[in-house]
Amino acid sequence: MLAMTLISCCLAGPALAQDEPVVFGGGFIADDHFAYAGALIPLPGAQPDQGWAVRPVASAGAYDYRRNSADIEADFINLELSLVNRRSGDWGYLNLAAGARYSNTDLSRPDPQNRREGGQWDGMVSIDGARYAGAWRVGGYASYAFSIEDYYIRGEATRAVRPNGLRLGLETIIEGDPSYDRQSLGALVAFQPMTGTEVRVSVGGRKGDDDTEPYLAIGLSRSF
């Protein structure tokens, strides 16, 4: 089972945002897998990295799990739309968001304990931001969906090692709902191949459901 799919983009996108849209996308591969794409679109009257914006996101993927000695496979799609209040300065940035998500999860066999089964709407809130301190950057993202009680918390610390925006660091993730929980720890590389574009790659391990597995995550954001 997966928490919200807004992972790498939520930390990379706002930092690059101007008074023009930012587009982002990426994917996550472990025993489960998913891909996402979205945009951060400033509303009229917004200043660079300040004011109101909307953030649509679409994602899809698959996962499997075990329930009462039975293996269950799931395919899902998520459509999200949030209203975002952006604040920024030399200190870093902070985004506060609230919105709605439509999700549709198809299970290979019925599971009454899986709240995600079928199509449903849910309200959600999130916060993300970063603090700059010289070559160091400490950032985080947290979200919560009310109906399925889904939570996702991600933190990272990176240090710039090259003038072209190359940063190295660590990330940690905690996610779950009443039926599962997972914890991840990985190494992170972020770089800017061109002005306004950032690529992020993280590799690590994830523990949950009495097993441990490796994961790979890739994110891309581009401001215009």
Regions found by a protein language model. Name each.
Residues 150-183:
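Intrinsically disordered, low-complexity segments enriched in Gly and acidic/Ser/Thr residues
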Residues 30, 53-150, 170-174, 203-205, ...:
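Outer-membrane pore/translocation modules
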Residues 41-43, 85-87, 127-131, 144, ...:
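Residue-level signature of outer-membrane beta-barrel architecture
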Residues 14-68, 215, 222-224:
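Short glycine/proline- and aromatic-enriched beta-strand/turn motifs that initiate or cap beta-hairpins
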Residues 123, 187-191, 211-224:
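Outer-membrane beta-barrel "beta-signal"
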Residues 19-31, 37-44, 86, 99-103, ...:
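Outer-membrane beta-barrel proteins and related beta-barrel translocases across Gram-negative bacteria
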Residues 1-20, 91, 224:
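Cleavable N-terminal export/targeting peptides
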Residues 16-20, 43-53, 88-94, 132-137, ...:
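Short loop/turn motifs that connect adjacent beta-strands in outer-membrane beta-barrel proteins
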